[in-house]
């Protein structure tokens, strides 16, 4: 079956003997697989090219060309006339004489010529079919020979491939055996490693547990050592120093130095406690003077000193003994023989802690009171600074006004010197000037020192007061002055914004009022005929409506001058 099917599938292909290589035994390449298709495409292209150069009347349709080239179109004509088909007849020249059957006995020359043409076409078609059949038979024989050669070659290749597969299977079996042996060895090694690692982990866990217990016991031992009296601790330290003679020259100086440091620290803390007690007494006295209820302290400074001295003796006992250079391998010694002794020491320490807590609370309360007083003083100073700045601005404005008045007076004096001097007017001006000077003096200094001073002396005092205020302003920190200026600017901007909003609201109310009046007013009825524009007489009196800006300026001037 394969030998019969392959020629039909690979028709038109030619295979050369020995063209395939030995490394590709399963591939057969056909050279002329698409040769018929390529020839048809080339024929179509040439036919298109020829049709482009032909005239219109020279061109033919596809159906006409097929009729002229095919004899089947001629065969389809006769069954329609006679009602018969050529399928009844077998292959060969038998259908040719039967074409005449069913035709009329009387025929024209044209019909005879057509019949002869049809006969010729049928004979030609039969001959071409015979030739093509012979050609196909030759091709089939050649392809069968080629297929036999290919089958033989395939058998040889299959034998070689089977040999290769057998060798490959043998090698894979050997490799699998080696891999299995390696995996077994690896599993044994991993099992041994796991066992060793588990043993190591167990040892490490035991070491960690023992280290934890050792730390806990050392902590408890150091705690008991800390709770023991100081003289006993010094004795134990001396014993350890004597036991380790190599380290005696290093440990004893350190112990003495630490003891001296602890004593100095105790004295400093006692001094600080005395100072804080004095501060608390001052604060309580100050509160009593201000009218607030005074608070009595629970303990005197002497009691605090004694309690602090007792507490420091037990707190500092471990620091000079917990040195890195001390030996821990010595046999431990305990001062406490019974648990009740340790509990008694702990109770005493608890009482000392309570006293210290109460003392710290007292100190915190005193600090809060001091902070409150400081805040009150700061507020007072800030208010004084603001007041002084306002006074300075007022005095500067008064000085500017007085300078302007002095310039006016100087001009008037020059006019008086040219012969226009009037003693009455001069006296009136001097009286008004003295009144203004007294007003400025009262504003700047007050009414207390107004007795028996002439205007010049008052001006001198005002000037000295201004100098003092300028010095005070310079002594004030720049940050405070800038903060006050910012506050004043903020107040001025807020005031300006409020005035602007009030003006806007008033203007809106005026507009609403005008709109309401316009809505409520009765409409004007036009009487008579309306005049034309060019015949309207000019009005004699022109009414000018006040603008909004003018009303605003007038209202601002009225507020400035009359409020």
UniProtKB/Swiss-Prot annotation:
User: Under which name does UniProt file this protein?
Assistant: Coiled-coil domain-containing protein 38
Q: What is this protein for, i.e. what is its function?
A: Essential for male fertility. Required for sperm flagellum biogenesis. Also required for acrosome biogenesis. Required for the attachment of developing acrosomes to the nucleus during spermiogenesis and may be involved in the transport of fibrous sheath components.
Which InterPro entries does this chain map to?
A: CFAP_domain-containing, DUF4200
Which source organism does the UniProt entry give?
Homo sapiens
Q: What keyword terms does UniProt attach to this protein?
A: Cell projection, Cilium, Coiled coil, Cytoplasm, Cytoskeleton, Differentiation, Flagellum, Spermatogenesis
Q: Recall the GO molecular function terms of this protein's record.
A: ubiquitin-modified histone reader activity
Tell me which domain of life the UniProt entry assigns to the organism this sequence originates from: Eukaryota
Query: Where are the annotated coiled coils located?
Result: 129-212, 384-415, 497-522
Q: Where is the composition biased (Polar residues)?
A: 1-11, 282-299
* Any one annotated GO CC term: sperm flagellum
Query: What is one Pfam family matched by this protein?
Result: DUF4200
| Residue stretches of biased makeup (Basic residues) | 523-533
A single Gene Ontology biological process assigned to it is: intraciliary anterograde transport
Query: How does the annotation summarize its subunit structure?
Result: Interacts with CCDC42, CFAP53, IFT88 and ODF2. Interacts with CCDC146. Interacts with TEKT3. Interacts with ubiquitinated histone H2A.
Q: Where is this region: Disordered?
A: 1-21, 272-311, 522-563
Where is the protein situated, by its record's location annotation?
Cytoplasm, Cytoskeleton, Microtubule organizing center, Centrosome; Cytoplasm, Perinuclear region; Cell projection, Cilium, Flagellum; Cytoplasm, Cytoskeleton
């Amino acid at each position: 079956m394969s030998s019969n099917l392959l020629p039909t599938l690979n028709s038109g292909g030619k295979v050369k003997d020995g063209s395939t290589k030995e490394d590709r035994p399963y591939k057969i390449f056909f050279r002329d697989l698409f040769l018929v298709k390529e020839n048809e495409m080339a024929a179509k292209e040439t036919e298109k090219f020829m049709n482009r150069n032909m005239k219109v009347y020279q061109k033919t349709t596809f159906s006409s060309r097929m009729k002229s080239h095919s004899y089947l179109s001629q065969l389809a004509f006769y069954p329609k006339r006679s009602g018969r088909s050529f399928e009844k007849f077998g292959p060969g020249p038998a259908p040719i004489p039967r074409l005449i059957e069913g035709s009329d006995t009387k025929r024209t020359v044209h019909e005879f010529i057509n019949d002869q043409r049809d006969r010729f076409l049928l004979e030609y078609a039969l001959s071409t079919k015979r030739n093509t059949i012979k050609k196909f038979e030759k091709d089939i024989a050649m392809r069968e020979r080629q297929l036999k050669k290919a089958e033989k070659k395939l058998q040889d290749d299959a034998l070689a491939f089977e040999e290769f597969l057998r060798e490959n299977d043998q090698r894979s079996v050997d490799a699998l055996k080696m891999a299995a042996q390696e995996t077994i060895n690896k599993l044994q090694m991993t099992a041994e490693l796991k066992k060793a690692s588990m043993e190591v982990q167990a040892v490490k866990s035991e070491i960690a547990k023992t280290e934890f217990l050792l730390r806990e016991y050392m902590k408890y031992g150091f705690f008991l050592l800390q709770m023991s009296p100081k003289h006993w601790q010094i004795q134990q330290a001396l014993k350890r120093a004597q036991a380790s003679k190599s380290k005696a020259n290093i440990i004893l100086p350190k112990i003495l130095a630490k003891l001296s440091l602890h004593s100095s620290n105790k004295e400093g803390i006692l001094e600080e406690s005395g100072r804080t007690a004095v501060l608390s007494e001052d604060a309580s006295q100050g509160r009593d003077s201000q009218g607030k209820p005074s608070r009595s302290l629970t303990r005197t400074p002497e009691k605090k000193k004694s309690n602090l001295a007792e507490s420091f003796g037990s707190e500092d006992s471990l620091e000079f003994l917990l040195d890195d250079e001390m030996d821990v391998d010595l046999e431990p010694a305990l001062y406490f023989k019974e648990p009740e002794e340790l509990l008694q020491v702990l109770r005493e320490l608890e009482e000392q802690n309570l006293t210290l807590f109460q003392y710290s609370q007292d100190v915190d309360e005193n600090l809060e009171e001091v902070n409150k007083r400081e805040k009150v003083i700061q507020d007072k100073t800030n208010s004084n600074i603001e007041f002084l700045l306002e006074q300075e601005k007022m005095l500067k404005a008064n000085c500017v006004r007085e300078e302007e008045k002095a310039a006016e007076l100087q001009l008037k004096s020059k006019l008086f010197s040219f012969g226009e001097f009037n003693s009455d007017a001069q006296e009136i001006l001097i009286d008004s000037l003295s009144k203004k000077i007294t007003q400025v003096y009262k504003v700047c200094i007050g009414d207390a020192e107004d007795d028996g001073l002439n205007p010049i002396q008052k001006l001198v005092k005002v000037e000295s007061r201004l100098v003092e205020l300028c010095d005070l302003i310079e002594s004030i920190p720049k940050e405070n002055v800038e903060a006050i200026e910012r506050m004043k600017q903020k107040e001025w901007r807020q005031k300006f914004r409020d005035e602007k909003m009030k003006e806007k609201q008033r203007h809106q109310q005026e507009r609403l009022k005008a709109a309401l009046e316009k809505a409520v007013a009765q409409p004007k009825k036009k009487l008579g005929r309306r005049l034309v524009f060019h015949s309207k007489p000019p009005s004699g009196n022109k009414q000018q409506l006040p603008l909004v800006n003018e009303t605003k300026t007038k209202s601002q001037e009225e507020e400035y001058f009359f409020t």
